[in-house]
């Protein structure tokens, strides 16, 4: 077996190449001692197994403990600590000179190296030609031109790994005699301590460049002081010598014929990064994403809903009736397992549409620019602009968004991002929005969803601002991010990335929703006295009584006593937001007698025909939904006979539904998110996030509902609005007091 490390600069296409090399044969774990995700994969060439470890993207292997991210530390340590046979160095052909700096450091390890020269098609389009044979000769290692996103050159790269055994010699750098003597003395000291010649050579260069994580700097201090007395800093001399050598190589192998594509990127950036237009363009992109997800994805939602309802709910119920199964078994299987499957599959088109659009923004190169657009606004409030990159990930799931905060340099910025990320609307919340949009906002639903996403972003920024003023005071780190050239992503790549994200989401959602639906079905079938109810709605069930006990707490935000299923949905939503839809779907179906199956009513072929018929019907109305949403289809009027109809009667109209959605958006993160907050920060920040999110969610929902209903009961509304305002002020005061308390404790500890 051959074990290879995959390393390169950020945005060089390393992850795309990793996916192309390993396909689906990947494993995800954690690096020892830290929470950074470790990705490994493997593939077979004949009978030879090759294992690939994907290292985090880095610009340099110099790891200075001051201001280094966990990702950079992992990459720097891995090339030393891991057992491997060769290194695959991914280089962006459009930025050859910049990326060869990391290559020059890798050569000093003395290990076999294969250079994967990626994005050759983009380089050619930008008028850049590279003589790969001459580059291979000058570097002394294999150089394989590839286009990872099209799988071009990947088989040749795989074959090269079979013959990758020749150790690479370091580049010959032009250094002064004094500097070279210091490096030689440093190398000899390391050899005398038992290091192999290759590692001694590598360590001497890293130590001279200021690497504080090697662990051997103490005994070399005298040599470094000697150098400082004679001439410039050695780290500067080494960097200058590297760039000089790299420039010589690039001059010999690279020619620029035309920069038309570069001009296109520059011209487009003048618009996208315009001082006044950049922010409106960013919001327009976000708006288009929700428009695309709700309208395009929603056009296929009825197909998945009707077909799975016919097969898994009505079909399983009918079959069990034919087998004379007890009512409680029918309820458990049809309205439990069947409804869980139906719920999970129904929101696939909306989630898939959003993942597709997110992949489009990311692969095109726009998402990196979005971080720069919001950087100025966030830094004005003392918040790190780099936080926005993990927060964008939160549109898919809050868990990887929080984990992505580890790429930030300072501990303060990491903690701020961890606390801000849960307010980003994840894809599970989008599934909830889609259900309520269908029931309460059939016209212009994308505007409702856009407003919720915007409120989530604003609340995240507000949370960061409050923490910056209280418990996490300090200055934001500057944003340093490479802007990739604009790409025209291939449909195959977009579909592949969408499929990978969707499969993970459906698996995660399904394994939670289906068991929860079964449990809810059981609790709704068991009476308070311990008996078993029939398949009809039971107001004496355990679930009903628990929900009715808690429901008065939510009365100020418009949830009335008879709408206890909505309360239960919030409770189960703390387990996972995906479960909310399943809870509502299951309970409203049972409360409203929806889904009761009899042999006379079940029509399998009719249901499947209706499912397929919904696609052209919804697509025919797509134009009016996109361009004239106010007069969009009236097809949703038939929802009065379904779960949506039951929901619309239980909630206090659109105002009550929107107040409920505000609470869903802002309240306590799911258990997975809470666990990762504790993992990435600590228990104190986890509980702070729980309390803060609940208070903010409750106050926002109550203030909105009472404000909307102010004319109906002005005195009551005024009392609630004032009470919520005071509760927020109290929590803010606690934050501020806790900071002072911490300050006194630290001062006492230091004396």
Curated annotation (Swiss-Prot):
InterPro entries: Fe2_transport_prot-B, Fe2_transport_prot_B_C, FeoB_GTPase, G_FEOB_dom, Gate_dom, GTP-bd, P-loop_NTPase. The gene is feoB. The chain crosses the membrane at residues 276-296, 341-361, 385-405, 422-442, 447-467, 512-532, 539-559, 657-677, 685-705, 715-735. It comes from Legionella pneumophila (strain Lens). The keyword Hydrolase does not apply. One of its GO terms (cellular component) is plasma membrane. GO terms for molecular function: ferrous iron transmembrane transporter activity; GTP binding. It comes from the Bacteria. GTP 2 binds at residues 33-37. The keyword Transport applies. Probable transporter of a GTP-driven Fe(2+) uptake system. It holds the Pfam family Gate. Keywords: Cell inner membrane, Cell membrane, GTP-binding, Ion transport, Iron, Iron transport, Membrane, Nucleotide-binding, Transmembrane, Transmembrane helix, Transport. Residues 1-167 form the FeoB-type G domain. Belongs to the TRAFAC class TrmE-Era-EngA-EngB-Septin-like GTPase superfamily. FeoB GTPase (TC 9.A.8) family. It is a multi-pass membrane protein. This is Fe(2+) transporter FeoB. GTP 1 binds at residues 8-15. GTP 3 binds at residues 54-57. GTP binds at residues 118-121, 147-149. It is found in: Cell inner membrane.
């Amino acid at each position: 077996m051959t074990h290879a490390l995959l390393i390169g600069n950020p945005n060089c296409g390393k992850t795309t190449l990793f996916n192309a090399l390993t396909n689906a044969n990947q494993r995800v774990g954690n690096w020892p001692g830290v929470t950074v995700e470790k990705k490994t994969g493997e593939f077979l060439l004949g009978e030879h197994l090759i294992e690939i470890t994907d290292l985090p993207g880095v610009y340099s292997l110099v790891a200075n403990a001051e201001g280094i991210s966990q990702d950079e530390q992992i990459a720097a340590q891995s090339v030393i600590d891991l057992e491997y046979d060769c290194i695959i160095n991914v280089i962006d052909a459009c930025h050859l000179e910049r990326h060869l700096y990391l290559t020059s450091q890798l050569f000093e390890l003395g290990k076999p190296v294969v250079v994967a020269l990626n994005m050759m098609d983009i380089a050619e389009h930008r008028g850049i030609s590279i003589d790969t044979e001459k580059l291979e000769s000058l570097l002394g290692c294999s150089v394989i031109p590839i286009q990872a996103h099209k799988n071009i050159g990947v088989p040749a790269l795989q074959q090269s790994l079979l013959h990758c055994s020749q150790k690479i010699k370091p580049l010959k750098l032009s250094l002064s005699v004094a500097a070279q003597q210091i490096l030689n003395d440093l190398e000899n000291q390391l050899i005398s301590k038992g290091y192999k010649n290759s590692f001694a050579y590598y360590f001497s260069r890293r130590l001279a460049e200021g690497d504080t994580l090697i662990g051997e700097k103490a005994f070399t201090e005298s040599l470094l002081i000697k150098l400082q007395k004679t001439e410039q800093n050695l780290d500067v001399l080494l960097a200058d010598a590297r760039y000089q050598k790299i420039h010589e190589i690039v001059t010999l192998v690279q020619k620029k014929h035309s920069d038309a594509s570069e001009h296109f990127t520059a011209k487009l950036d003048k618009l996208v990064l315009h001082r006044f237009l950049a922010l409106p363009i960013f919001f327009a992109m976000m708006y288009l994403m929700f428009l695309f997800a709700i309208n395009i994805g929603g056009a296929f939602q009825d197909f998945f809903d009707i077909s799975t309802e016919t097969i898994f709910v009505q079909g399983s119920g009918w079959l069990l009736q034919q087998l004379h199964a007890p009512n409680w078994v029918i309820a458990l299987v049809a309205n439990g397992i069947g409804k869980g499957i139906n719920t999970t599959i129904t929101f696939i088109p909306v989630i898939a549409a959003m993942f597709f659009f997110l992949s489009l923004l990311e692969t095109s190169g726009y998402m990196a620019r979005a971080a720069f657009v919001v950087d100025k606004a966030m830094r004005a409030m003392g918040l790190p602009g780099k936080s926005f990159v993990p927060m964008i990930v939160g549109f898919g799931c809050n868990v990887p968004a929080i984990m992505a905060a580890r790429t930030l340099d300072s501990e303060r910025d990491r903690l701020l991002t961890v606390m801000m990320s849960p307010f980003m609307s994840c894809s599970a919340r989008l599934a909830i929005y889609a259900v309520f949009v269908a029931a309460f906002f059939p016209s212009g639903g994308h505007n409702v969803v856009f407003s919720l996403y915007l409120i989530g972003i604003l609340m995240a920024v507000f949370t960061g601002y409050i923490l910056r003023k209280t418990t996490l005071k300090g200055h934001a780190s500057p944003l340093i991010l490479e802007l990739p050239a604009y790409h025209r992503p291939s449909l195959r790549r977009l579909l592949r990335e969408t499929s990978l994200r969707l499969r993970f989401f459906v698996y995660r959602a399904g394994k939670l929703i289906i068991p929860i639906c079964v449990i809810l079905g059981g609790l709704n079938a068991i009476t308070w006295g311990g008996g078993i109810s029939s398949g009809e709605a039971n107001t004496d069930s355990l679930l009903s009584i628990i929900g009715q006990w808690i429901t008065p707490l939510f009365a100020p935000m418009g949830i009335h006593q008879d709408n206890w299923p909505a309360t239960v949905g919030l409770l189960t939503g703390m387990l996972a937001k995906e479960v909310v839809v399943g809870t509502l779907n299951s309970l409203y179906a049972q409360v409203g007698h929806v889904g009761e199956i009899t042999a006379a009513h079940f029509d399998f072929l009719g249901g499947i025909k209706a499912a397929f018929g919904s696609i052209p019907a919804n697509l025919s109305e797509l134009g009016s939904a996109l361009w004239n949403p106010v007069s969009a289809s009236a097809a949703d009027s038939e929802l009065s006979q379904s779960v949506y109809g039951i929901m619309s009667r239980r909630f206090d109209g659109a105002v009550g539904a929107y107040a409920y959605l505000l609470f869903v958006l802002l309240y306590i993160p799911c258990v997975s998110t809470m666990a990762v907050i504790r993992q990435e920060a600590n228990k104190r920040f986890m509980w702070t996030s729980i309390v803060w999110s609940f208070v903010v969610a409750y106050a926002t929902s109550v203030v909105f509902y009472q404000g909307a209903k102010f004319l109906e009961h002005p005195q009551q509304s005024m009392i609630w609005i004032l009470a919520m305002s005071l509760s927020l002020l109290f929590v803010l005061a606690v934050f501020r007091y806790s900071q002072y308390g911490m300050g006194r404790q630290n001062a006492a500890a230091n004396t």
